[in-house]
């Protein structure tokens, strides 16, 4: 199916966006957010060591490291933390990032660091120009926008509040993530969104780069348009969704 034809979206009253690969380059997290943690970790630990927030972060990391040591998991060699040693915390965080762990304690610290990075201007949430323009066109039509991403609601809000196009939070009615809604590859998550918002499924258009998510949304009666961007997954030749390389191809 062609990814360049113009598609009318005038019948939809609500637009729900994925982030990575849709509004934002798919490499943004890997090439901007995670490198920021590695680059700023030592300074962050040194400068916030006495803060209650960092003390809680360190305690959570310490508890996880102790659980790892007493387990038979692949992480039983995780560096242990001495609460009097900043270097032990740094070593533990680097170890867990190298292992690409999704543990709560690590995500908590990273979230606090990203917040500081955004607030200080060291991180800007990258939003495609055509995505921003589409947000503008949607609002001019008096229609609503929601965000549904696997990234936490906090991370979503930081990206859009401190974006390359300024504070975009006023454009959005609400934010959904996998913790408050569920897995994006499951029909039940989209049913839950319909129940929570009270919006008829025929009124919503979902925009995502992931065909598996589009299939799950379709099972709940929600239409989707696939976002084809640099680095997004190649679509199967026989897929039956509309697809665009830019939101300028969507028109009212």
UniProtKB/Swiss-Prot annotation:
Q: InterPro entries this protein is in? A: Enolase-ppase_E1, ENOPH1_eukaryotes, HAD-like_sf, HAD-SF_hydro_IA, HAD_sf
The UniProt keywords, alphabetically, are: Amino-acid biosynthesis, Cytoplasm, Hydrolase, Magnesium, Metal-binding, Methionine biosynthesis, Nucleus
Q: Which residues bind Mg(2+)?
A: 18, 20, 209
Q: Which GO terms describe its biological process?
A: L-methionine salvage from methylthioadenosine
The record's function comment reads: Bifunctional enzyme that catalyzes the enolization of 2,3-diketo-5-methylthiopentyl-1-phosphate (DK-MTP-1-P) into the intermediate 2-hydroxy-3-keto-5-methylthiopentenyl-1-phosphate (HK-MTPenyl-1-P), which is then dephosphorylated to form the acireductone 1,2-dihydroxy-3-keto-5-methylthiopentene (DHK-MTPene).
The similarity annotation says: Belongs to the HAD-like hydrolase superfamily. MasA/MtnC family.
Name assigned to this protein: Enolase-phosphatase E1
């Amino acid at each position: 199916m062609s990814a360049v034809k113009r598609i009318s979206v005038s019948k939809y009253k609500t637009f729900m966006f994925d982030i990575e690969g849709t509004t934002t380059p798919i490499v943004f997290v890997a090439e901007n957010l995670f490198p920021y943690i590695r680059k700023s970790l030592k300074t962050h630990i040194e400068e916030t060591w006495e803060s209650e927030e960092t003390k809680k972060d360190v305690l959570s990391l310490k508890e996880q490291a102790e659980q790892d040591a007493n387990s038979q998991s692949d992480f039983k060699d995780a560096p242990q933390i001495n609460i009097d040693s900043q270097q032990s915390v740094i070593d533990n965080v680097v170890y867990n990032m190298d292992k690409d762990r999704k543990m709560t304690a690590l995500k908590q610290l990273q979230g606090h660091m990203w917040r500081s990075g955004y607030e200080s201007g060291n991180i800007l949430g990258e939003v495609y120009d055509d995505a921003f323009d589409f947000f503008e066109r949607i609002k001019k039509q008096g229609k609503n926008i929601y965000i549904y991403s696997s990234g936490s609601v906090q991370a979503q809000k930081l990206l859009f509040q401190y974006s390359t196009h300024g504070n975009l939070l006023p454009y959005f009615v609400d934010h959904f993530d996998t913790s408050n809604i569920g897995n994006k590859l499951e029909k039940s998550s989209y049913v839950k969104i319909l129940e929570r918002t009270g919006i008829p499924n025929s009124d919503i258009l979902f925009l995502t780069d992931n065909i598996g998510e589009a299939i799950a949304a379709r099972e709940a009666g929600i239409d989707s348009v696939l976002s084809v961007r640099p680095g997004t997954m190649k679509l199967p030749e026989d897929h039956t969704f509309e697809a665009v390389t830019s939101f300028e191809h969507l028109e009212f």
